[in-house]
Swiss-Prot record:
Subunit structure: Monomer.
Name of the gene this protein is made from: hemH
InterPro entries reported for this sequence: Ferrochelatase, Ferrochelatase_AS, Ferrochelatase_C, Ferrochelatase_N
Name of the protein in its database record: Ferrochelatase
Annotated function: Catalyzes the ferrous insertion into protoporphyrin IX.
NCBIfam families hit by this protein: hemH
């Protein structure tokens, strides 16, 4: 019997190719055109997106990207490539490809790369620890569209999420411990997750429950009292209500109440990006300190640390 050859597809959101208004506009157009991200009626959404949002937001967002851009590209791309390369070294007999839902490299190019290696089974690992229809669901949809155009398709194992995975929780806990050792234990550990519209959760997206699961498991692993750990949601967009409490409003409130020392971690981000390095590490730091807080540290994402790569290797091993 012929032995199955397995490949691994690491999937993430994506990033502009450059910190310029033109590149950001291309990226945002693709991202905000996905019904999984914005499900507003197209008759209403297209004119708003093309006539207002893209022209106004692209130059401003490009400046934010420029503030965190690295020598080799955007942080998300740099760290994602490092993850791909490190996992390939950890699993030398298994092809590992990287694909993004939006921008380059695309999910289609990643699938084609693996098929060119003659794999007949692909393990898809969306690097979103907590499932949401707007992230993991978007990967699923695009993968289905890609394979629908193939005459022959490989076997697919799709990892829905890993919110309570033991190795993932331990890696997060060790990052927190390292930060406490360096900066001292903070008055409060704030866990900031990317938000989604509240309506999505009301309609069945179990993302908030998966975030609560990670928060509970991490607090338990650290042996921290519940009142010392807080969960919030960031990066809201548009006018409708999103999951609460909001990170920026919470940090302002905590500073005003006299909480002196905060450390913030973003467990839902597998790699540092604009939302962590600029929004959390810079913007929200200013919010907290401006409201009266004294000390604020951002705990980096797991990125391509050895623990994170080992977690990925162990996670996909069950499906190989």
């Amino acid at each position: 019997m012929r032995q199955t050859k397995t490949g691994i597809l690491l999937a993430n959101l994506g990033t502009p190719d450059a910190p310029t208004p033109e590149a950001v506009k291309r990226y945002l157009k693709q991202f905000l055109s996905d019904r999984r991200v914005v499900d507003t009626s197209r008759l209403l959404w297209w004119p708003l997106l093309r006539g207002v949002i893209l022209p106004l937001r692209s130059p401003r967002v490009a400046k934010l990207y420029a503030s965190v851009w690295m020598e080799d590209g955007s942080p998300l791309m740099v760290y994602s490539r490092q993850q791909q390369q490190a996992l390939a070294q950890r699993l030398p007999d298994t092809p590992v490809a990287l694909g993004m839902s939006y921008g380059s490299p695309s999910l289609e190019s990643a699938v084609d790369e693996l098929l060119a290696e003659h794999v007949d089974h692909i393990v898809v690992l969306p690097l979103y620890p907590q499932f949401s229809c707007s992230t993991v669901g978007a990967v699923w949809d695009e993968l289905a569209r890609i394979l629908a155009r193939k005459r022959s398709i490989p076997g697919i194992s799709f990892i829905r999420d890993y919110a309570d995975n033991h190795d993932y929780i331990n890696a997060l806990a060790n990052s927190v411990r390292a930060s406490f050792a360096k900066h001292g234990e903070s008055d409060l550990l704030l866990l900031s997750y990317h938000g989604i519209p509240q309506r999505y959760a009301d309609e069945g997206d179990d993302y908030p429950q998966r975030c609560r699961t990670t928060t509970r498991e991490l607090a338990s692993a650290l042996g921290m009292a519940p009142e010392k750990v807080m969960m919030t949601f960031q990066s809201r967009f548009g006018r409708e209500p999103w999951l609460m409490p909001y990170t920026d409003e919470t940090l302002k409130m905590l500073g005003e109440k006299g909480v002196g020392h905060i450390q913030v971690m973003c467990p839902g981000f597998a790699a540092d990006c604009l939302e962590t390095l600029e929004e959390i590490a810079e913007q929200n730091r200013e919010v907290f300190l401006g409201a009266g807080g004294k000390k604020y540290e951002y705990i980096p994402a797991l990125n391509a640390t050895p623990e994170h790569i080992e977690m990925m290797a162990n996670l996909v091993a069950a499906y190989r």
